[in-house]
């Protein structure tokens, strides 16, 4: 999930349904992944300098999403793991000891089989791996959980996006419960996987002290958090909704004041 404007290759309004299935990415198709875009030089999406790979498709419909062009499944540029890694390694000289690749979306876990192949081959090349996810697809049930366990063996750092700590408010904001997202956070703590928490601060929605305190208290129960990032809500992706001819849900919401961002940081950093 980026905090910068992405590209808009074009998305039909019919693509905005919240019904997304992992079945679209079945095993026979896993030699290639559906890629939304790549960026060669990322400095905020994981440790060090990163080559960023944004996979296509997302089950969430976050009201503040600035990349609705990444929602639809089964579209995008089809790339193999080796093609992406060959491209990434052109920039390896910039990575230093901490850099590598970060895979985001959309929601990267929608293409977990391709992601497994990509990270497996990255490790064979000695490339550091980072996963940026909302974890909405997480479950401890088969077959997903066995794949996720293996994925975590291949993942150095997880950037976990927690949209809202309150389940009812989370449903309003994203059309989905946060129960499995919070369970994923617990699981990552259980296996001691390094995690960066990301939380978008939206005036009137996620910036209430009550919710920030609840989020802080939840994060305080985890033992693997390396960083907590408060991302101020912005409107940089509104033009995409205009191009699509659909209403932007938060058109009357302005970015948070600096004081509210500082307040959120003061509260959430107490969890570290």
Locate predicted features.
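N-terminal basic, low-structured, amphipathic or hydrophobic segments
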Residues: 2-10, 19
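N-terminal polybasic/positive-inside topogenic patches
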Residues: 15-24
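Auxiliary Fe-S-binding modules of radical SAM enzymes
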Residues: 24-44, 196, 201-272
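Canonical Radical SAM [4Fe-4S] cluster-binding loop centered on the CxxxCxxC motif
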Residues: 31, 37-79
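Conserved alpha-helical substructure of the radical SAM core
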Residues: 68-101
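Short glycine-enriched, charge-decorated loop/helix-capping segments at active-site entrances
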Residues: 69-73, 171-177, 245-253
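Conserved AdoMet/S-adenosylmethionine-binding subsite of the radical SAM
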Residues: 89-93, 97-100, 105, 109-231, ...
């Amino acid at each position: 999930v980026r905090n910068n404007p992405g590209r808009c290759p074009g998305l039909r309004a019919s693509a905005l349904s919240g019904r997304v299935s992992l079945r679209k990415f079945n095993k026979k198709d896993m030699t290639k992944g559906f890629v939304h875009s790549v960026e060669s030089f990322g400095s905020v999406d994981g440790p060090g300098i990163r080559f960023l790979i944004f996979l296509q498709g997302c089950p969430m419909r976050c009201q503040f999403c600035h990349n609705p062009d990444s929602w639809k499944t089964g579209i995008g540029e089809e790339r193999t793991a080796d093609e992406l890694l060959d491209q990434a390694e052109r920039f390896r000289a910039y990575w230093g000891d901490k850099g590598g690749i970060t895979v985001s979306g959309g929601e990267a876990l929608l293409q977990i089989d391709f992601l497994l192949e990509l990270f497996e081959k990255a490790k064979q090349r000695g490339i550091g791996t980072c996963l940026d996810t909302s974890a909405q697809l997480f479950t401890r049930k088969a077959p997903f959980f066995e794949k996720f366990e293996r994925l975590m063996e291949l993942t150095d750092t997880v950037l976990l996006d927690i949209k809202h700590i309150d389940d009812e408010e989370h449903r309003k904001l994203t059309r989905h419960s946060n129960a499995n997202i919070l369970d994923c956070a617990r699981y990552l703590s259980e296996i001691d996987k390094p995690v960066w928490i990301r939380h978008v601060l939206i005036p009137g929605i996620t910036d209430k002290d009550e919710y920030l305190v609840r989020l802080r208290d939840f994060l305080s129960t985890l033992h693997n958090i390396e960083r907590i990032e408060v991302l101020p809500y912005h409107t940089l992706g509104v033009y995409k909704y205009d191009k699509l001819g659909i209403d932007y849900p938060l058109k009357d919401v302005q970015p948070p004041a600096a004081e509210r961002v500082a307040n959120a940081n003061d509260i959430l950093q107490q969890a570290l």
